Each structure stands twice: as structure tokens, then as C-alpha cells.
Amino acid sequence: ITLDHPPLNSVSKRMMVEMMRALDEFEQNDVVRAIMVKANGPDFSYGADGGDVKKGINGEAEEISESFSVLGNRLVERIDCCPKPTLVAAKGRCIGGSTAMFNAFDIRIVGEGFRMHDGDIYYGTVGSWGMSSLRLPMWIGRNKVLDYMFLNEDFTGRQCYELGLASEVVADELVEVVGLATAKKMSKA
């Protein structure tokens, strides 16, 4: 699966629905033994598509934002509970809701230039997909999350690896190659 929503690979409602359809297809296909997700362009994803979140400012924005959040949570849960092994090969920036999506994969290969940043922390909002407030403390511990939140810093690819948020760090130009090789290994396991 390739994220391809230029210029920033923003996560739109359409992208989420298409990803869930692809996951459904792959799960039903006995030939598919592992599922890999990558992104077109220099960055994995800049998170939620502002246009999808803000549509209908005149009274319906809250409802649309809520439905966007519900769909995002469903996608993250869908990836996390996929019965087939999943892998993400990511480089560049990974911001906001895409951090929750990224961390839902079983295996996470990142480039040396990878940067993960929770946009909700920057804007002072509660993470709609549960990344900073729910999932991250379970994985890296409360104190590290507080550092991340209060200092508003990115996690580098190396830090993600050291904290267990990434399975492997490779040169940016090798992310997809290593991801594909790893997916092939996964499909034989």
C-alpha cells in the first residue's frame, strides 16, 4: 500500500477508507502473507488533512471532526489487529495522527532522517487517535512521554529505535528496499 496524497501525504477520509478496503482485500487473499505500507515522496505523512477536518465550519465542523476522529481510530485499530503481519517503511516527517498509524504496524523500518512529531501536542489539543495520551505511555513510559510533550521535540529515527518505536533504522535511500526485504522474510515465517 502506498500513501500518495501530495504534497504532504495528509491523511484524508478517502485515504483511510481506501486503506481499510485494501487491508480487507489483502486479508481475504491467501496469496498475500504480509502487508507493507510506504509513502510516495520525501515524507511519510503530515497527519490529518486539514480540509477534511475543517469542512463545514458553519455548525457541522464538530460533527465532521468527530467522524474523522472515529475513522482514524478505526484505521489504527484495523492495522493493529490485522491477522496478517504488517510493516511500514517510513522516512521523512511523520506528524499528528500518522504517528498513531505508524505505531500500529507490527514492524517499523525508518530512515535516518525520520522525524516523528505529535502535532496535537504542538497545538495543545488532545490526541484524537490516542497516540500521545494512551498508546505512547504504554510503550515508552510516562516520564519519557512527559519530556516529549512538555519539550515539544521530535523523536528522531535513532531515538525511535532506541525507545522501541522502530524495529530498524537504515539510510533514507534504503528504507523501501529494506522494508521490502523484511516483508518477504515475514511472508516466509
Task: Please annotate each region the language model reported.
Residues I1-N40:
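Conserved CoA-thioester-binding segment of acyl-CoA-metabolizing enzymes
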Residues E18, K38-R78, C94, G124:
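Glycine- (often His-adjacent) and acidic-residue-rich active-site loop
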Residues V37, D49, M101-N103, C160:
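Hydrophobic/aromatic residues within transmembrane alpha-helices
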Residues N73-Y123:
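Glycine-rich beta-to-alpha active-site loop
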Residues E77, T99-A100, L134, L146, ...:
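Alpha-helical segments flanking ligand/cofactor-binding loops in enzyme cores
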Residues D106-I107, D147, L151-E153, Q159, ...:
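Well-ordered beta-strand positions
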Residues I109-F114, A166-A189:
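C-terminal long alpha-helix characteristic of the crotonase
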Residues S133-N143:
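Hydrophobic, secondary-structure "cap" segments at the distal end of domains
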